[in-house]
Amino acid sequence: MYAVIKTGGKQYKVTEGDVLKVEKLNAEVNTTVELTEVLLVAGGDNAVKVGKPLVEGAKVVVEVLSQGKGPKVINFKYKPKKASHRKRGHRQLFTEVKVTSIIA
């Protein structure tokens, strides 16, 4: 059984046991979170349930494994022949989760 979920403005295809990095969730490590924005559920009874836009009563339960920061991305802008430049760095926050169950 698999599902397509939406979290942090992105969509992910998940199955039970998957470990993935999603945009930061406000949850403590080793807690469970229910993701209710389920767009599609398939498998199990060989039926595909497509939401309009969400599947009614479906949710995905995930366990928070860790919180962290991604790799540093450098943004450097400059103007040729001028003494003008700007350097900025950014590290995106993420949450690593493990899918424990898909409830449809």
Swiss-Prot record:
Q: Give one GO term, molecular function aspect.
A: structural constituent of ribosome
Q: Name one GO biological process term.
A: translation
Query: GO terms for CC?
Result: cytoplasm; ribonucleoprotein complex; ribosome
> What domain of life does the native source organism fall in?
Bacteria
Q: Which InterPro entries match?
A: bL21-like, bL21-like_sf, Ribosomal_bL21, Ribosomal_bL21_CS
**Disulfide feature:** none
Spell out the coiled coil positions from the record: none
Q: Does the keyword Ribosomal protein apply?
A: yes
Going by the UniProt record, its keywords in alphabetical order are:
Ribonucleoprotein, Ribosomal protein, RNA-binding, rRNA-binding
Question: Which family is this sequence assigned to?
Answer: Belongs to the bacterial ribosomal protein bL21 family.
HAMAP family referenced in this protein's UniProt entry, alphabetically: Ribosomal_bL21
Q: How does it assemble?
A: Part of the 50S ribosomal subunit. Contacts protein L20.
Protein's job: This protein binds to 23S rRNA in the presence of protein L20.
Put simply, this protein is called: Large ribosomal subunit protein bL21
Could you tell me which species this protein originates from? Answer: Fusobacterium nucleatum subsp. nucleatum (strain ATCC 25586 / DSM 15643 / BCRC 10681 / CIP 101130 / JCM 8532 / KCTC 2640 / LMG 13131 / VPI 4355)
